[in-house]
Structure formats: C-alpha cells, structure tokens
C-alpha cells in the first residue's frame, strides 16, 4: 500500500480492503504522417495480425475497426491480467453505439510474420468512429481506493460518504481525492467510472466482471457528450485468457 496523503491517513485501515491496482494510460494523439509500430500499444492504427489470419468483420461482412491494441509486454503487471501477448478490441464502424458488434482477440505469441496490407480499411470507414486519430500509448502503475459509481465501492469515512468528505476538502486535496477515488481516464483494471450508472449492478451474472479496458473522452476522443467506453470480462475468463465473452458498455452525460 502506497503512502496515503495526510488527510486520508486516519482512514487507512478502512481503505485497505478497497485497494485495487490499475495501469493508467497516457494516450498521445499522433501528428500527421506519424504511425506506431505494428505490435505497439495504440488506439486506432494498424493491428498486429499473423499472416493468413482472418480480419474481424461484422455480421454483414463489413470490417470492424481496431479501437485499441494492448501489448502487455509494455504494461505494468496486474494480477490476473496477461504478462505478455497482445489484446485487441475491434468494434463496428457505424453501429458502435449499440455495443453489440465487437470482437476481442488475444495473441499469446507475436513472433509470427504480420500482415501489412489492409486495403479495405478506407478513410470513410472511420467517419463515425469516436476515436478521431491514432494514439501512441504509455502506461503507469496506479493504486485506487474506490470509484464513486462502481458497484463494488461502498467505502465510508468515519460515517461520511465519499461525497460528504469531498465537500470538506481544500482544492488541492480534492485533486488528490479524484485520482484515488473517481476512476476517470483511460486505464486497464481498477475501478470504473460512469457518467450514469454501473451496468454490472443490474444482473447477478455480471457481479464477477472486471474492467479489461476503459477509454475516456479526451482531446481527440469523444463518446457522445463526454462519455466513457468500457470493456468488461469475467474474472475467471481473464485468468484463463478466454476473451470470447468480453462485452462493451458506454454512457455519457
């Protein structure tokens, strides 16, 4: 457990049981003409696909778009998550808001020669994509102690709710509190942030699902009215590297 700020130290024992590690993502929009390495972590861009592998398509045969590629050899290790290999998130080009047409691929090994020619990924395919350009990704390990909308978080501060405590804090303290408890931003794991409500709270079958990836609205990313997109996976499926049942959800203000 990392050192808590002074104004939270009196709650250390109570907060310990809520501690989760996450990998924060710094997403840097690429400038015109820049590209990422085919195996690198990225938002948008060219995916790593072994030669001969089928490119993911929707039920009508239309190519899905690579929203994100995570190379776990570049990412701080998180319990239960892969230590190596590439996880990819492909989403419908024009019906992404329905959250139905998605495909998540896991490449445990990446030493096979990659495909390099994707002529069907034309510019018009990206017209409705909420991620507006390719991003280079960097990662930083973080600790979180709650998410104000995450159904798993019910922490109290000597009888005060997170919101009641927040109202008593100084501006600088509020910034620190936000980092530890609000769950915003791009990240892997940890607590999830919602502008509306946590969909896992509405069905027992989702209670064991964790965040595989959260993509937040940013300078070059916009989900509706500053919303957030999520990809959830059953914790046992994650441990077993079974990504066939990953599901997507997004909401906005």
Label every model-predicted segment.
Residues 1-253:
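Preference for intrinsically disordered or flexible, low-complexity segments
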């Amino acid at each position: 457990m990392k050192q808590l700020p002074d104004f939270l130290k009196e709650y250390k024992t109570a907060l310990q049981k809520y501690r989760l590690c996450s990998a924060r993502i710094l997403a840097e929009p690429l400038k015109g003409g820049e590209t990422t390495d085919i195996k690198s972590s990225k938002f948008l861009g060219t995916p790593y696909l072994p030669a001969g592998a089928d490119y993911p398509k929707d039920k009508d045969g239309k190519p899905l778009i690579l929203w994100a590629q995570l190379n776990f050899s570049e990412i701080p290790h998180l319990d239960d998550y892969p230590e190596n290999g590439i996880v990819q998130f492909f989403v419908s080009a024009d019906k992404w808001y329905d959250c139905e047409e998605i495909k998540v691929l896991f490449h445990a090994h990446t030493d096979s020669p990659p495909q390099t020619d994707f002529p069907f990924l034309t510019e018009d395919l990206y017209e409705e994509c909420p991620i507006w350009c390719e991003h280079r990704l960097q990662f930083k390990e973080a600790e979180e102690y709650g998410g104000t909308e995450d159904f798993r978080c019910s922490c109290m501060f000597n009888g005060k709710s997170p919101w009641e405590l927040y109202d008593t804090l100084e501006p600088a303290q509020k910034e620190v509190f936000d980092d530890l408890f609000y769950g915003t931003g791009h990240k892997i794991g940890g607590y999830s942030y919602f502008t509306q409500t946590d969909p896992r709270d509405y069905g027992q079958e989702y209670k064991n699902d964790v965040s595989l990836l959260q993509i937040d609205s940013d300078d070059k990313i916009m989900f509706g009215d500053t919303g957030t997109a999520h990809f959830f996976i059953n914790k046992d499926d994650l441990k077993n590297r079974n990504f066939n049942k990953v599901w997507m959800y997004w909401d906005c203000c």
